[in-house]
Amino acid sequence: MTDTTADQTRHGDRPYDVVIIGSGLSGTMLGSILAKHGFRIMLLDGAHHPRFAVGESTIGQTLVVLRLISDRYGVPEIANLASFQDVLANVSSSHGQKSNFGFMFHRDGEEPDPNETSQFRIPSIVGNAAHFFRQDTDSYMFHAAVRYGCDARQYYRVENIEFDDGGVTVSGADGSTVRARYLVDASGFRSPLARQLGLREEPSRLKHHARSIFTHMVGVDAIDDHVDTPAELRPPVPWNDGTMHHIFERGWMWIIPFNNHPGATNPLCSVGIQLDERRYPARPDLTPEEEFWSHVDRFPAVQRQLKGARSVREWVRTDRMQYSSSRTVGERWCLMSHAAGFIDPLFSRGLSNTCEIINALSWRLMAALREDDFAVERFAYVEELEQGLLDWNDKLVNNSFISFSHYPLWNSVFRIWASASVIGGKRILNALTRTKETGDDSHCQALDDNPYPGLWCPLDFYKEAFDELTELCEAVDAGHTTAEEAARVLEQRVRESDWMLPALGFNDPDTHHINPTADKMIRIAEWATGHHRPEIRELLAASAEEVRAAMRVKP
């Protein structure tokens, strides 16, 4: 008798309520929520913990949604991932800090121009973000899920999935079976459910193209030590205090340090490169490491930053990484997060997207389990959200790769993305605040009531601006206009915008570093109070005292 069969026998052959394939962060957060609310959950995974995983960088919106699902569903361990300080205190000291998104523009053989950099400091109103050392965060949530009552099988290879009117049967390579009322596949690219049901789109509808080479390194210097920047052009916080993006024509490189704070105990740094495979075809004549260094050597500042670095784990080199699925929900199943599709680590949206899907799926799935009604229609919004998250992020990243050959065009992409991220994050934060104040979950459910599921700022005026951005970038890509002309039009739109948070400098293309201090956020709140757009008033208007309290600063 296998362990899995034994688990079900102890419960009188009663099926599990939900079987979750994949015990990474998405599977274990969902499993913890469901088990906390009294449902029987089985986690299946072909690997084990601790283990390496990608998705190490968080964003402000990730922190807010982590807090929201923790409070909404009563799982405090999830909130322990929602700030740098809480991760250090509750998970481990192996994580890095992330105070900012940093972008540095590069050309072959040239030093970077200090006037061609962009930094977006994460607003303290949402907290301090972290660089997740995923083997620790994932193991932490796995053990939390087990404590809440999830059963788990590691090293479990799924061979077959069979649905019938009463539920689902998962068969393992070891001959065991797991019976459940519902299945969630939270695995990844090699999703057993996507494979068996033929859900992968071939070819993918996604526009973005990139392949990847990555590893963990020691000996990575701070880029701050290797660029000569006049004092007046330096960013408000060091580049090394956050995630560094070295951007260049049709590609970018990430530097994600875990050792960038005084209490650091982890010497590692996550390093990788994304390359449009149409511009940079794979080099089978080179090892992954050799190919990586061939690109590092193109850019003098990056070469200096990595001069003393060496890899401490095997290199990974992929083909094109983008994939999508024709459906993500069905009768008694859901294909979740990276099992459904993937775009690119640019903008660090992976974990944020995962949390949004968990938030939308959890209450619907619990209601379906209680009512024994798994009609696909009740999960329709989850499908819309998953597909929307893929499609909007695909456009954003594709626009960015197009703009990476022309800094003024990239400058507009950066502003239109980052300004809306502040507004969209505040929308979620407001729902969390009102829910905590009233105990009324309708404020959280209202987040689902928007016309553009998956768009980080689902408001009409932002969609209009983003659509124009996409149209112009795609026209550049098709050769119908020049990057210079597209940049000129977008710069004018940015300057004339009535919603782009003027106190932060988003509508001034010469303000390269966005630093949301308390004084600036108070000015934004005052500006919003009399704004002609009701959405701006509703989302951003506040008193100076409320802003200071939210940012934890004294008058």
UniProtKB/Swiss-Prot annotation:
Lineage: Bacteria, Bacillati, Actinomycetota, Actinomycetes, Kitasatosporales
Taxonomy, superkingdom: Bacteria
Reaction it catalyzes: tetracycline + FADH2 + chloride + O2 = 7-chlorotetracycline + FAD + 2 H2O + H(+)
Signal peptide, first to last residue: none
InterPro entries, A to Z: FAD-bd, FAD/NAD-bd_sf, Flavin-dep_Halogenase_NPB
E.C. no: 1.14.19.49
GO BP, sorted A to Z: antibiotic biosynthetic process
Protein's UniProt name: Tetracycline 7-halogenase
Subunit structure: Homodimer.
A GO molecular function held by the record: FAD binding
Pathway(s) annotated for this protein in UniProt: Antibiotic biosynthesis
Cited Pfam families: FAD_binding_3
UniProt keywords, alphabetically: Antibiotic biosynthesis, FAD, Flavoprotein, Oxidoreductase
Enzyme class: oxidoreductase
UniProt entry tagged with the keyword Flavoprotein: yes
UniProt function note: Involved in the biosynthesis of chlorotetracycline (CTC), an important member from antibiotics tetracycline (TC) family, which inhibits protein synthesis in bacteria and is widely involved in clinical therapy, animal feeds and aquaculture. Utilizes FADH(2) supplied by the flavin reductase CtcQ, to catalyze the chlorination of tetracycline (TC) at C7 position, leading to the production of 7-chlorotetracycline. The enzyme forms a lysine chloramine intermediate on an internal lysine residue before transferring the chlorine to the substrate.
